[in-house]
Amino acid sequence: MRRKRYVWLKSILVAILVFGSGVWINTSNGTNAQAATITQDTPINQIFTDTALAEKMKTVLGKTNVTDTVSQTDLDQVTTLQADRLGIKSIDGLEYLNNLTQINFSNNQLTDITPLKDLTKLVDILMNNNQIADITPLANLSNLTGLTLFNNQITDIDPLKNLTNLNRLELSSNTISDISALSGLTSLQQLSFGNQVTDLKPLANLTTLERLDISSNKVSDISVLAKLTNLESLIATNNQISDITPLGILTNLDELSLNGNQLKDIGTLASLTNLTDLDLANNQISNLAPLSGLTKLTELKLGANQISNISPLAGLTALTNLELNENQLEDISPISNLKNLTYLTLYFNNISDISPVSSLTKLQRLFFYNNKVSDVSSLANLTNINWLSAGHNQISDLTPLANLTRITQLGLNDQEWTNPPVNYKVNVSIPNTVKNVTGALIAPATISDGGSYAEPDITWNLPSYTNEVSYTFNQSVTIGKGTTTFSGTVTQPLKAIFNAKFHVDGKETTKEVEAGNLLTEPAKPVKEGYTFVGWFDAQTGGTKWNFSTDKMPTNDIDLYAQFSINSYTATFDNDGVTTSQTVDYQGLLQEPTAPTKEGYTFKGWYDAKTGGDKWDFATSKMPAKNITLYAQYSANSYTATFDVDGKTTTQAVDYQGLLKEPKTPTKAGYTFKGWYDEKTDGKKWDFATDKMPANDITLYAQFTKNPVAPPTTGGNTPPTTNNGGNTTPPSANIPGSNTSNTSTGNSASTTSTMNAYDPYNSKEASLPTTGDSDNALYLLIGLLAVGTAVALTKKARASK
């Protein structure tokens, strides 16, 4: 199946075979030169000025010397010319070979191909691996069917646009970026090109293509390839392809190479069931499930991906070549069914168990270097192996490989493994386990720390602790016809256990730790009012221990918990207006200036809005939390004095409290208006809404004087008798009096009541005396006097 890997090389070799291993001179049956002719016999080296070409033509023309002359007839006999790898720098003179049909000038130093411009009989040109940049001379060679120019310096391929008979065109490894000139070359069956191409649209009409190589370009979009349904081989390595969906309908493909792209999803490949050769190396593939049905595959390359599971490959039993190198494999058991494998690569993985290959008896080449394999006994029956590469593993015993007599290539260098740890002692001894193919122990080449070897043991004398000792081995071994150096290093770790003591404010815990290991960090200790800073090698100061990187030394250690004191915030809340202080744990707060509040006396700062405990700024210490202290007040009590014409009573009421309204006072001849904050005028006190201010107050009873009715004339109004039988004399205005219409019976009662006035406790209480009772007495006496005078006057008149 290797032939498919070199499809373009195959085409070149076919052309070379046509030429043969030597040089042929064919008769042209009288065909005359079309491009140029010589008119007389001329020395070879004058026609072909390049020394190397002249030497070649001497042989081709059957001459002895390059100075021998030849005629045009001689030159016309040459139809094919094989001149590769001769160091030719110029093809001057080739223009006289008018009958040339095939030439091979590969691997020379050509820069100018002008002599070809009129050689229109040419059908096949091979000029790969030169220094050609200008291919204009090929523009008129319309009979060309095959043209190979890979690995030159070509940028412009426009001169090829009219070469419509081309069916093979090879232009890889140039500097081509534009392939639009190819759009009309619809006869092409094989095509390769460039390394700077990004746009494949010009290929849309090349539907006869069977083999296409677009390797080493800058292609990301391959949608146009969906039209090329006749493709059998597609090589698209080293591009920028991430989406291969367009390939899903190319079911004629038997060879596909997508090596070196950006593939993650290969689901499209599930439909390409005719594939026999698939190269997906150097991508980002992890899921191989789409490959499970590609049962015709014989070659599969999956190296340098992200594969950890190869189960989908278990049914691909036609595989002969499988590459799984540079992945993330640990389990390779699915390959045990692939019994037709002859070639298997597993290098640079994480494989420790190679036993699944034991059933692959057809294996000829096996590569599993740079893994973790220690036991190779499963290889014992793989007698067809001729190439075994198993370096950089952990192999110590070669005995199982003794029967692999067909080996010609062998690699067993740089084995390396570490034994299980043993406890450190002054004298340490371990057995040597390294064996060659015959089973004999291989003596150490070097032993660390002054150790010595007495078969089968290696011994060290270690007066002070060291964490490991080691030895190396190095011996030439031969298996079959393959000879290599079996070499490696064996490391023996030594455990040293020491105490790590952890101190937290005088309390101690101890852990045993092996030297060189990381300590397990204890749970962080908690200390009220403090933040744990870390574990230090001193009680104060010192160096903080890093549990991620610091390793146990070869001695006991003491680590101390260190803390930093926390700061907390005390918020002072004065009826919603706040200030704050930041104080360390257990610190004393600075007492704020005592706040004031109208009508209240500041009691102090408390830990609750109401109730709670009072904060003592001299002794109370900051707790391990933020706190809020509230200003609390006691309402002040103020005195309200009620003044009724100089007679007073009082009430004590808290600030903003409501006063209890006294019983309405009375005053003869007046109507009570209410209580006012001034003797006259002022504001009337509303006992339902007005609240006690933050000061003592006096409220004054105010009255309005009742109107006085005028006295009746003619004595027509009879006196009024009250319930007590007293006669009320008619009302009269008395100058200087403060009262009017006051009865004699009520006057005495009012005076008595006023002398005993209590506005809050007596329901019978009357207003305090106003001083008007004396005037009433005088009025009464006056009225009696007037009445007496009137009576006496009437009596005198009657007696007359």
Curated annotation (Swiss-Prot):
Propeptide feature ranges: 771-800
LRRNT domain: residues covered: 36-76
Pfam families with a match to the protein in the record: Flg_new (PF09479), Gram_pos_anchor (PF00746), Internalin_N (PF12354), LRR_4 (PF12799), LRR_adjacent (PF08191)
Predominant cellular place of this UniProt entry's protein: secreted
Modified-residue entries (Pentaglycyl murein peptidoglycan amidated threonine), positions: T770
Function of the molecule: Mediates the entry of Listeria monocytogenes into cells. Binds to host receptor cadherin-1 (E-cadherin, CDH1).
LRR repeat boundaries on the chain: 77-98, 99-120, 121-142, 143-164, 165-186, 187-207, 208-229, 230-251, 252-273, 274-295, 296-317, 318-339, 340-361, 362-383, 384-405
Region entry 3 X approximate tandem repeats, type B, spans: 518-706
Disordered, as annotated region: 705-757
Record-stated family: Belongs to the internalin family.
Motif LPXTG sorting signal in this chain: 767-771
Places the protein is found: Secreted, Cell wall
Segments annotated as B- repeats: 518-587, 588-657, 658-706
The species this protein was found in: Listeria monocytogenes serotype 4b (strain F2365)
UniProt keyword GTP-binding, yes or no: no
Cysteine disulfide partners in this protein: none
Residue ranges with Low complexity bias: 711-756
Superkingdom field: Bacteria
Keyword Secreted: yes
Residues in LRRCT domain copies: 416-505
Taxon lineage: Bacteria, Bacillati, Bacillota, Bacilli, Bacillales
Signal peptide from the UniProt entry: 1-35
This protein's name: Internalin A
Membrane topology: Peptidoglycan-anchor
GO cellular component: extracellular region
Keyword tags: Cell wall, Leucine-rich repeat, Peptidoglycan-anchor, Repeat, Secreted, Signal
